[in-house]
């Protein structure tokens, strides 16, 4: 019954019952006091600090400014006083402040300056319920007391400026900040404000050493960092509760930075291809945000590395154009030491390519290095679109002392290298393909800088269809098109590397916004629910197979009120259903750390997903997942909802909580995190399926995306998690794919998710911030469980379907989630 969709007390994946029996859930996850034991909290804090140490990225370090040798420093900027830790601004989480962390490393902080920020905090402006505050609270230079900064220079000649940006929590970042506190007309949220520019100029004109700390989960517009007066810069993401301890250790030199950027940092957001067809909410008289993915697969580094290749006879201005656009490439990150890397072997193992990389620490201090392997696939005009390079694998060394060496074995599954051939140019029909030809196996410092390369030949085309290799590993059916309508809508305007000029001249997509879903007519009728007395309890069925007739017999015992409780979730808990012996159970949401607002419980605040991805450390991410699972158990929650899957199309897009702009990195991090959580005996729910954001929106956003981009980029983390069997619930949201809400899109929720991928778990829709009208359409499309305001949704109204038809839909949904 849907009770299993809601709670996964006995989740059935691929027809086999999960490892947790009813008695465990009934005794462990009961309401009441839930808190972290002291040893668990300490271990989690240590792991959170380690994750931040590995993730922080050194962007700039002129003349080896860092690590610092002088202990007296000045902290400047409002974000040095009120930084963004994550977790919706640390609410309920324990956090160590920048000043506290620096003092622990024996730094001496200018208290006169710090006291000024504490006493002159600008009060946040009020926002509507559910709205994110994007105000910028930097203090104008006119409000600084005369002589304060000159006095600070006398205290120490080192200025450490902190500029902060928060996560967007499922929203687009403001494209114009005029309406927000501290904002400027014509500037977007990820630009420096005038007040911040003035502070930076004041610091650069006074202090001999200027260090910039960027406290943001997504890239900011970074052209200002090219100023030679800025000596060093670090990106710290939203570092979590212990992250400033990690930053202090790096500034002091106790830890060498080792993070690698999970996104491309550009000089000007206007150069991003994903911005071309975006209409911010309210623009041009529209009441919805519309994003047309005309760039296709060419987002992030895939665009810049393909659009602006190294200068040559065919593109003499390539290098200059690239440098004018990209400040820091995907995968970039400096260290206090240096490494020599080379490929020593490439072996074609059939379904997997094995690459051996030899790494030597050639510097004077200890450190860890990440070997990044990219693939350059053969391409000719008329073949399926492919980026010039794509990340194919990565590996990380142990802590290497100066002169120490290590060999890394990096595996590249062929299925991670496939291309979606929408036009069927390889096999005559749309399919996943790997074209024959010479493939460059590239060892790179980042997505732009090649260190070593080898060549691998693929002798014949590999086609994953019914007449070729069949479905991909772990899937039920060979892939077939499911987004034809959207693909056709973008025909002729989607970017092709064969003709960049045509893409540049195409302009925004014309799109007619669909009408809002109307409420069902009063005459639609209502279902009559007569619960049976079959004498069954959930505990009786814990070892039954998914197709056992006892499951529908159990479902028949549900009353109308049971349906409302179990199919519609209002918050972070489920209500008990005595008719089938289901207890009250808690869920937790992962937002930096786990939290359950219903019970008022929080765990440890870990770094933001993007900073976790910057670690490139699979084992570490699995450990973080395990710790999150252990904390969920200690807080008596049996399910964790995770918004980190997905791919960041643009820094300004509503995807600030996902891991990366790269699908392989996002997918691998997602799988490791989920496997860690499951290993602690906790169920997992991935949110944001078929959405731009992992956090549910209001249903006012429209995403128009073609088949190739959807499959190769935005759905890839969900696909890989489903194939690995580490996700128990897959949850979509209210925003539209083309003209259809994702939760009512049968091609997504049934054809792809269940038919092709073979996913047996519950499919859910988070509609808490949206109008949930159209339940029958959602059920018919394959959605089983609804997170929604119960007062706004009535499952017993027939909607557009007749009462009998909807009763069948409910019964089918209940059987699916068993």
Regions found by a protein language model. Give the residues of each.
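Glycoside hydrolase catalytic-domain context in secreted enzymes
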Residues: 1-449, 466-818
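Short beta-strand edge segments in extracellular beta-sheet folds
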Residues: 455-465
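Extracellular and select intracellular beta-sandwich modules with Ser/Thr-enriched
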Residues: 450-454
């Amino acid at each position: 019954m849907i009770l299993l969709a809601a709670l996964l007390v006995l989740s059935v994946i691929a027809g086999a019952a999960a490892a947790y029996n009813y008695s465990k859930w009934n005794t462990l996850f009961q309401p009441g006091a839930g808190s972290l034991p002291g040893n668990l909290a300490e271990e989690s804090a240590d792991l959170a600090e380690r994750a931040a140490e590995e993730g922080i990225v050194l962007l700039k370090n002129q003349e080896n400014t860092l690590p610092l040798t002088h202990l007296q420093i000045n902290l400047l900027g409002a974000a040095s006083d009120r930084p963004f830790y994550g977790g919706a601004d640390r609410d309920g989480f324990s956090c160590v402040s920048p000043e506290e962390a620096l003092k622990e490393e024996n730094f001496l902080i200018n208290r006169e300056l710090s006291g000024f920020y504490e006493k002159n905090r600008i009060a946040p402006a009020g926002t509507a319920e559910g709205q994110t505050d994007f105000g910028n609270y930097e203090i104008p230079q006119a409000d600084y007391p005369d002589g304060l900064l000159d006095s600070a220079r006398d205290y120490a000649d080192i200025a450490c400026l902190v500029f902060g940006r928060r996560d967007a929590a499922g929203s687009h970042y403001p494209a114009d900040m005029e309406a927000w506190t501290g904002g400027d007309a014509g500037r977007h949220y990820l630009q420096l404000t005038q007040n911040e520019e003035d502070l930076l100029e004041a610091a650069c004109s006074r202090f001999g050493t200027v260090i910039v700390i960027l406290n943001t989960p997504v890239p900011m517009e970074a052209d200002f960092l090219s100023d030679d007066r800025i000596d060093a810069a670090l990106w710290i993401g939203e570092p979590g509760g212990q992250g400033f301890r990690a930053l202090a250790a790096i500034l002091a030199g106790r830890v060498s930075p080792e993070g690698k950027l999970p996104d491309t940092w550009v000089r000007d957001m206007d150069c991003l291809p994903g911005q071309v067809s975006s209409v911010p909410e309210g623009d041009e008289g529209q009441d919805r945000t519309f994003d047309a993915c005309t760039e296709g697969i060419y987002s992030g580094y895939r665009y810049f590395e393909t659009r602006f290749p190294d200068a040559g006879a065919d593109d003499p201005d390539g290098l200059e154009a690239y440098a004018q656009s990209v400040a820091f490439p995907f995968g970039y990150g400096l260290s206090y030491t240096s490494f020599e890397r080379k490929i020593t072997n490439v072996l074609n193992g059939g379904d997997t390519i094995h690459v051996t990389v030899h790494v030597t620490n050639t510097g004077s201090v200890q450190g860890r290095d990440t070997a990044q392997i990219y693939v350059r696939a053969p391409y000719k005009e008329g073949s399926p679109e492919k980026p010039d390079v794509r990340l194919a694998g990565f590996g990380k060394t142990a802590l290497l002392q100066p002169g120490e060496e290590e060999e890394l074995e990096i595996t590249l599954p062929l299925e991670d290298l496939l291309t979606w051939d929408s036009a069927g140019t390889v096999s005559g029909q749309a399919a996943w393909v790997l074209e024959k030809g010479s493939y460059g196996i590239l060892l790179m410092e980042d997505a732009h800088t090649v260190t070593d390369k080898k060549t691998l030949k693929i002798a014949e085309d590999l086609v994953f269809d019914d007449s070729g290799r069949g479905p991909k590993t772990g899937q039920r059916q060979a892939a077939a098109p499911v987004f034809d309508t959207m693909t056709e809508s973008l025909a002729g305007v989607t970017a092709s590397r064969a003709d960049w000029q045509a893409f540049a001249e195409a302009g925004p997509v014309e799109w007619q916004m669909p009408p809002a879903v109307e409420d069902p007519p009063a005459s639609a009728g209502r279902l009559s629910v007569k619960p049976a007395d079959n004498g069954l309890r959930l505990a009786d069925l814990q070892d039954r197979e998914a197709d056992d007739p006892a499951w529908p017999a159990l479902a028949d015992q549900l009353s109308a009120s049971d349906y409302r409780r179990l199919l519609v979730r209002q918050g972070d808990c489920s209500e008990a259903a005595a008719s089938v012996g289901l207890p009250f159970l808690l869920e937790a949401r992962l937002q930096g750390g786990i939290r359950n607002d219903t019970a008022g419980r929080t765990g440890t605040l870990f770094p933001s997903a993007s900073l976790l991805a910057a670690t490139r450390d699979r084992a570490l991410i699995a450990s973080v997942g395990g710790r999150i699972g252990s904390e969920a158990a200690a807080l008596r929650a049996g399910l964790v909802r995770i918004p980190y899957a997905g791919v960041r199309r643009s820094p300004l897009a509503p995807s600030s909580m996902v891991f990366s702009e790269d699908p392989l990195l996002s997918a691998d991090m997602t799988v490791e995190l989920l496997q860690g959580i499951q290993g602690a005996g906790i169920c997992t729910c991935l949110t944001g399926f078929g959405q731009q954001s992992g956090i549910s929106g209001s249903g006012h956003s429209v995403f128009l995306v073609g088949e190739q981009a959807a499959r190769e980029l935005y759905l890839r983390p969900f696909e890989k998690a489903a194939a690995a069997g580490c996700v128990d619930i897959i949850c979509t949201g209210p925003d539209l794919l083309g003209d259809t809400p994702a939760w009512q899109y049968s091609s997504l929720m049934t054809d792809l998710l269940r038919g092709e991928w073979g996913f047996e778990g519950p499919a859910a829709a988070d509609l808490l911030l949206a109008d949930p009208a159209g339940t029958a359409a959602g059920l018919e499309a394959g959605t089983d469980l609804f997170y929604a305001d119960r007062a706004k949704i009535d499952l017993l109204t027939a909607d557009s379907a007749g009462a009998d038809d909807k009763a069948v839909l409910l019964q089918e949904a209940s059987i699916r989630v068993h």
